[in-house]
Design a protein with these regions (language model features):
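Zinc-coordinating Cys/His ligand positions in small cysteine/histidine-rich zinc-finger domains
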Residues: 71-75
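Active-site hotspot residues in diverse enzymes, especially metal/ion-binding acidic/histidine motifs
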Residues: 80
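Histidine-centered nuclease catalytic patch
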Residues: 31-70, 85-90
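A boundary/linker detector
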Residues: 1-26, 33-45, 88-134
Length: 134
């Protein structure tokens, strides 16, 4: 199996992030909980759940809780495909949901940047070293 690049790893939700998202979202699709267009949701589609990216991986969206929410297969497909003409409305609902949970939420912080990662690693390492010496 080929090793994933740092960028590819950063865009995937790891086990810890997935667990945080599931607990935050009460193990339910965020759109099903608000009964969003349930006429287009099948029982089977509700049973299959996955983590949805607000900013997609294809646009550098990170695999962090601030960029994800739990979605059933039906709503996830509705969001990704936009075939019902509801994508923009769903993105607004998704954005508001994330802002409600993370007061300092911003779209800029949700995308991968090699330089952001370097700065974060530098600051985190310095802080960790400082805390371990004091």
């Amino acid at each position: 199996m080929a090793k994933m690049s740092k960028q590819a790893r950063a865009r995937e939700f790891n086990a810890a992030s997935r667990q945080i998202i599931k607990e935050r979202d009460l193990y339910q699709c965020i759109f099903c909980r608000m009964e969003y267009h349930m006429e287009d949701v099948s029982w089977y589609g509700q049973q299959l759940q996955s983590i949805m990216h607000y900013i997609p991986r294809s646009r550098g969206g990170l695999g962090i809780p601030q960029n994800g929410a739990l979605g059933c297969q039906s709503h996830h497909e509705m969001l990704d495909n936009g075939n019902k003409g509801r994508r923009e409305e769903m993105l607004q609902i998704f954005k508001q949901y994330l802002q409600d949970h993370y007061p300092d939420w911003s779209e800029e912080a949700l995308t991968y940047s090699k330089w952001k990662q370097c700065i974060y690693k530098f600051v985190y390492t310095k802080r960790r070293n400082y805390e371990s010496t004091n």
